Each structure stands twice: as C-alpha cells, then as structure tokens.
C-alpha cells in the first residue's frame, strides 16, 4: 500500500471519529451558528434620504408593530424601543 493511501485512510478515520464525538445525545449535530438571535430593536435611518442613524426602530422578525423613536426627541429612545416592541 502506498503512503498516500495510508494518509488518506488516516484522514477518513480521524474525520469519522470527530463526527462521532460532535454528536449530541439526541443524534443531532450541535451547530452554534443556528442559535443567532436578532434583537427586536435596530438603530437605523429616520428618513430615507438622510445618512445619519438617529432612530431606534422595532424591526424584529417577530415584532407585531413597526415603531420608531427618534434619539433627538427622546434621549432614552433605545430603552423605549426595547420596552415598546411587542414580541409574539
């Protein structure tokens, strides 16, 4: 057997062992990238033509209402946004 065959067999065996060790009790592979949470409030533009982000808006994927709070009118706009966003 050539040394390249032996190296290939070792790589396959190591990969199978790593795959076996990465499985959870339920048989599913744990992937931390699937647990990404999107915040309900996002700092964004108040108007379309302005390029300054002065508003906190409730744009979460599960938000029932699309509300925005301007930082210039409401100094605590971030707190109001997180308190006012209604999540299903």
From Swiss-Prot:
GO terms for biological process: suspensor development. It comes from the Eukaryota. Disulfide bonds join 41-57, 46-85, 55-81, 58-68. The keyword Disulfide bond applies. Expressed in leaves and flowers. The keyword Transmembrane helix does not apply. Belongs to the MEG family. This is EMBRYO SURROUNDING FACTOR 1-like protein 7. It comes from Arabidopsis thaliana.
């Amino acid at each position: 057997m050539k040394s390249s065959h032996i190296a290939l067999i070792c790589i396959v065996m190591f990969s199978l062992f790593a795959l076996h060790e990465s499985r959870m009790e339920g048989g599913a592979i744990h992937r931390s990238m699937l647990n990404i949470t999107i915040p309900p409030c996002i700092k964004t533009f108040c108007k379309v033509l302005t390029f300054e982000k002065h508003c906190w808006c409730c744009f979460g994927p599960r938000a029932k209402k699309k509300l925005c709070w301007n930082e210039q009118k409401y100094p605590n706009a971030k707190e109001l946004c997180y308190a006012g966003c209604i999540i299903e």
